[in-house]
Design a protein with these regions (language model features):
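A conserved helix-loop-beta module that forms one wall/lid of the active-site cleft
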Residues: 202-214
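N-terminal glycine/serine-rich phosphate-binding loop of ATP-dependent small-molecule kinases
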Residues: 1-97, 125, 153, 222-226, ...
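Pocket-flanking alpha-helical
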Residues: 86-88, 109-113, 246-248
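Short alpha-helix plus adjacent loop in nuclease-associated cores
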Residues: 100-117, 447-448
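Conserved small-residue
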Residues: 16-18, 23, 76, 104, ...
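Short beta-strand-loop/turn "lid" adjacent to the catalytic site in phosphate-handling enzymes
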Residues: 64-102, 130-134, 161, 165-186, ...
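Active-site core segments that coordinate phosphate-bearing ligands/cofactors
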Residues: 5-6, 115-128, 138-173, 180-201, ...
Length: 505
């Protein structure tokens, strides 16, 4: 029987699945890792230890758990956190820690420099939007200005998925979906290296070859087979970013579909049949031919609940270690005992700056309205509602500002384990949201793409028919009215305090 492997490397955890030709999961595995935060605003990974190390561990564990021969795996799909940057040598050895996505603000001086040099209009023309911390070109420029020897020595500047593909196949590639984050280093019309665009940042030969995410980049090499346990010669997909793979995992295939990914951060992908121009968002090419992804992302989601767990629920964490209930379940229970609106407590969830729609890496988190009657459960509730407000802000931009219909909102990621959070999103947005039948995330999307590329399915439409919805959450319209009445306070809190936030940095 043929099997298809999908592995995703995330911010704080990596996951993998093996599926059969009917998209049934036959084995799954995960492992945790730490994100380095050596300075305020710096977030980085050791690519060799985390990205490659996790991939090798998971591939071996999945083969063992499924009790299959490696040769039964027909195709390998992969994804990883996007908008990151690691310089590598000719053998794909990392030359420096990988700079992570928008949460890493070290390239802000380069972004400011580019905006000053080009002006906003020209910068938007080059980057597709106002340059921000999720763009990779400013990160490349950071290496050039701060680690010039590494910059000069680098054979390629890669994202995590490109790095993994190169380790597996020996070929340096990147898919079109992630290549958008490298603008203006690629030409969006031809997807070839833009030599003029590279001039300010790097050599043209330091860029990877652009392909489709579902293209076969190559096959498992001898060395990769030894390290991963996979069979030599197994086809490997180019791969893509975790958010794109996560959207695929939920069945977000058609214009009008929207994915809300609740992981360490929140990420949104709305599928459209045409490109839009909006400096607040990240519109670009999507994985599926003929579709465009209006993408957006916050800097905190699960990372904020993890902070609350760590700082306010140490007793629950200790109890969990001793065999008690999961600390996150305790937090959800406490939040559920607090009514909508958290008794007047609001949270601005900008604990690591903010990406869309604010594009402000110096934004800061706020709990507003605290009184003696508020408990830690109120703070959890307010944090979940604060993230729900950011979801609603993106829904409004898509529907009200661009007149695009949102037919379905699919929730995915670790946040779907929290019923209070899902209900808050439905209530703040005032619309139903659904949870995919399979919620293991991007690794499942990777396996689906491997099944498609490996011949188990002939089209995206055929693949869509085997996926489904596990749960639909209807909004409480009374709660929606309460949230709507306080929306202006949430918005004004940032607008009136952003200058003070910047003074603190």
């Amino acid at each position: 029987m043929p099997y298809y492997l999908g592995i995703d490397i995330g911010t704080s955890a990596s996951k993998g699945v093996l599926i059969d030709a009917e998209c049934r999961i036959v084995a799954q595995a995960s492992c945790q890792h730490e994100t380095e935060n050596p300075r305020d605003g710096w977030y980085q990974h050791d690519a060799e230890a985390i990205w490659w190390g996790d991939f090798c561990r998971l591939s071996r564990e999945l083969i063992e758990r499924a009790s299959i021969e490696a040769s039964q795996i027909r195709c390998v799909g992969l994804s990883a956190l996007g908008c990151d940057c690691v310089p590598v040598d000719e053998d794909c050895h990392a030359l420096a820690p990988a700079i992570l996505y928008g949460v890493d603000a070290r390239s802000k001086p380069q972004i400011d420099e580019l905006l000053s040099e080009y002006g906003s209009d020209r910068a938007r023309e080059l980057f597709g939007h106002d340059p921000c911390s999720s763009d990779i070109a400013p990160k490349v420029l950071w290496f050039k200005e701060n680690m010039p020897e590494v910059h000069e020595r680098a054979a390629k500047f890669l994202t995590a998925s490109s790095y993994l593909c190169a380790k597996l196949t020996g070929r340096f590639t990147i898919d079109r979906y992630l290549a958008e984050d490298f603008l203006p280093l690629y030409d969006r019309e031809t997807w070839r290296v833009n030599e003029r665009g590279c001039a300010r940042f790097c050599r043209p030969d330091q860029m990877a070859e652009v392909m489709a995410a579902t293209d076969i980049a190559g096959v498992i090499t001898d060395r990769a087979a030894d390290e991963t346990g996979l069979a030599k010669g197994t086809p490997v997909l180019v791969g893509t970013g975790d958010s794109g793979a996560e959207a695929i995992s939920t069945g977000v295939f058609c214009p009008g579909d929207m994915m809300v990914q609740l992981g360490s951060t929140a990420y949104f992908i709305y599928l459209a049949d045409h490109m839009v121009d909006d400096a607040r968002l990240w519109p670009g090419t999507f994985i599926i031919p003929g579709t465009y992804g209006i993408c957006a992302g916050t800097n905190t989601a699960g990372a904020l609940t993890a902070w609350l767990r760590r700082e306010l629920y140490r007793d629950a964490v200790d109890a969990e270690r001793s065999g008690g209930p999961d600390a996150y379940e305790v937090m959800a229970r406490d939040a559920g005992q607090v009514g909508p609106g958290a008794d007047g407590l609001l949270c601005l969830p900008y604990f690591a700056g903010e990406r869309t729609p604010l594009n402000d890496p110096e934004a800061r988190g706020v709990f507003f309205g605290l009184t003696e009657r508020h408990t830690r459960g109120h703070m959890v509730r307010a944090a979940l509602e604060g993230i729900a407000y950011t979801v609603a802000a993106h829904v409004d931009i898509i529907e009200r500002d661009h007149g695009l219909p949102i037919e379905h909102i699919m929730l995915v990621g670790g946040g779907t384990k929290n019923p209070v959070w899902m209900q808050a999103i439905a209530d703040v947005c005032g619309r139903e949201v659904s949870v995919a039948k399979v919620t293991v995330g991007a690794c499942f999307g990777d396996a689906l793409m491997a099944a498609l590329a490996g011949g188990a399915y002939s089209s995206w439409g055929e693949l869509a028919r085997v996926l489904g919805v596990a749960q639909t959450i209807e909004p409480d319209m009374d709660a929606h009215e309460l949230y709507a009445s306080r929306r202006h306070i949430f918005d004004e809190l940032y607008a009136r305090n952003c200058d003070l936030m910047h003074e603190l940095v």
